[in-house]
Amino acid sequence: MLTKALILFGLLALAQGYSFTSREVKCHVCKAVVTELEEAIAKEDPHKMADVSGFRLDAQGNSISKKVRLVKSEMFLTELMEKICEKMDDYLKATYKSNGKFTLLKMIINGQMNPDSSLVDFVQDGDLNKSLGHFCNEVLEDNDEIFVKAFQAEELGNDLDIKICSEQASYCDESPVQEEYDFDGKEEL
């Protein structure tokens, strides 16, 4: 009986060591969503076009038709966002062994176990990480227009996760990396 109590106390103490806010979790979920969307879009043919004609008619009664790249169409992006939260089942909450910093770790990358899994301690979660899917749905529901507009941009950029998750949705506190300043082309004062 004493052994069971000590084990239970040890597990509770271990679980108490991992405290992070829902904002931190949403930050990492938001970044994971951006990554998953980027990967899903990269798999599509960038030249495939979609007809986005509405129910508008011109003066002669013909429907007005407009074609856009499929990966930039609102319909495609919305459908993709509706499915993307299922990917959160592939992630686990973890903390880095080196600094105790919270992260979400995707378990399988390119059909292989994530090599970073040896660098982290996995967080035992009472809900078996099902909250990640709920956080994903919440992030997308609250920011669906932000995601669509960002992914419709002609150039996505390298720091799209920071632009969406930090600058617009305000889940993270990161800022984009500044461009390097060219000292060679400038005169001294």
From Swiss-Prot:
Disulphide linkage map: C27-C172, C30-C165, C85-C136
Signal peptide: 1-17
InterPro entries: CNPY (IPR042415), DUF3456 (IPR021852)
Short motif (Prevents secretion from ER): ranges: 186-189
GO BP field: chaperone-mediated protein folding; maternal specification of dorsal/ventral axis, oocyte, germ-line encoded; polarity specification of dorsal/ventral axis; regulation of protein processing; regulation of protein secretion
Keyword annotations from UniProtKB, A to Z: Developmental protein, Disulfide bond, Endoplasmic reticulum, Signal
Subcellular location: Endoplasmic reticulum
Keyword Signal belongs to the record: yes
Gene Ontology cellular component annotations, sorted alphabetically: endomembrane system; endoplasmic reticulum
Keyword Disulfide bond among record annotations: yes
Result of knocking out the encoding gene: Formation of embryos with altered dorsal-ventral patterning, dramatically decreased levels of ea in the perivitelline space and reduced processing of ea.
A Pfam family assignment: DUF3456
Coiled coil: none
Domain Saposin B-type: 23-176
Domain of life: Eukaryota
One of the record's GO molecular function terms: protein-folding chaperone binding
Protein family (similarity comment): Belongs to the canopy family.
Function: Involved in embryonic dorsal-ventral patterning which is generated by a series of serine protease processing events where gd processes snk which cleaves ea which then processes spz into the activating ligand for the Toll receptor. Required during this process for the secretion of ea from the developing embryo into the perivitelline space and for ea processing.
Protein's UniProt name: Protein seele
Organism in which the protein naturally occurs: Drosophila melanogaster
